[in-house]
Amino acid sequence: MYTLDDIKKEDPEIASAITDEFERQNSHIELIASENWVSPAVMSAMGSILTNKYAEGYPGRRYYGGCECVDEVEELARERAKELFGAEYVNVQPHSGAQANMAVQFAILKPGDTIMGMNLDHGGHLTHGSPVNFSGSYFHVVPYGVNDEGFIDYDKVEEIALECKPKMIIAGASAYARTIDFKRFREIADKVDAVLMVDMAHIAGLVAAGLHPSPIPYAHVTTTTTHKTLRGPRGGMILCSQEMQDKYNFNKAIFPGIQGGPLMHVIAAKAVCFKEALQPEFKEYQKQIVKNAQALCKGLQSRGIKIVSDGTDNHLMLVDLTPFGLTGKSIEKLLDAAHITANKNTIPNDPQKPFVTSGIRLGTPAATSRGLKEDDFDKVAEAIAMIIKEGESAVEPAKAIIKTLTDKYPLAF
């Protein structure tokens, strides 16, 4: 296996950037909800010689010779994913969650078909119908959102569906802190003869551990990323019944539809990730993610910080900065100076532009992987609240709090 020393010999500039990034991650508390730390085994699989192998097609039906070993890798990944989520069909080749979503939409829909997805400003995702994304360009999009309390209004979703008669309803989000009722979504979809697609990218780890209701029994087709709460490599996946695969041929939609050769080193890392997620320790890790999110949320609220929907059921939360007249952009910068990594994020009915925003999104998966517990997250909440309330003058005191945590939980790599 190659090491950083090998990179230093060939490319000292890249080696320096990698070293700097390690130091940044080690000295910061990562609260970006979509980030996590993979295991050494997952990382080793991604850096393996499998990156050398081209393998267009699927196991047993490749367009290249010498694929018997990578066939075994892909079969292991598929079978483990089936066991993990209880799905009949799995495709592990999507390079990303966005490409998994694209493949599903292109397999089922025609240009101009009507789809419903959560408004990006209310917590949805670009690929759920945003006008700046392919999904908003190829299809007629009718968005739904959250009510004044920050919850999905399922009666309103049904009302919109009955009016616009969509071909597809997309459930799932990138910034929604509450449990999603997939059963209710399926009932709505059935009333208008729509396909229900669920994007569980953010909550896949919680679903695998049984801490969030699974979409698999209700969705016609489910997509996900393999990183985030699942703690695997960056990549995507499609899951559904064999009947849905037979009807829409998602295999063909991925290859040759929107991709060429699969990334076999990443698929190997996915297989390792799925095996890790099948272990009892993974469920305990997911439980700690939720406990930590609730501790962070309560810690912020007890210090006068407003949380959208007044709480969280999963791994993330949205902080509403409007009571302080602040922007997500400014607070993200101050938090970074205090060695807290978070991202600015729109809140429902946000008056600010998407690159400015009135909120920040916080998540606990990465810091939980690092080892932080509830008491530690209360200290993180203290540091964040100081920054929001006191501004630049609080950067150094907040940074000192964070240093006690990063010293206590150094990165293992």
Swiss-Prot record:
GO CC terms of this entry: cytosol
Reported cofactor(s): pyridoxal 5'-phosphate
Site, as annotated: Plays an important role in substrate specificity: 227
Domain of life assignment: Bacteria
Cellular location(s): Cytoplasm
Family of this protein: Belongs to the SHMT family.
Full protein name: Serine hydroxymethyltransferase
Organism: Agathobacter rectalis (strain ATCC 33656 / DSM 3377 / JCM 17463 / KCTC 5835 / VPI 0990)
Gene: glyA
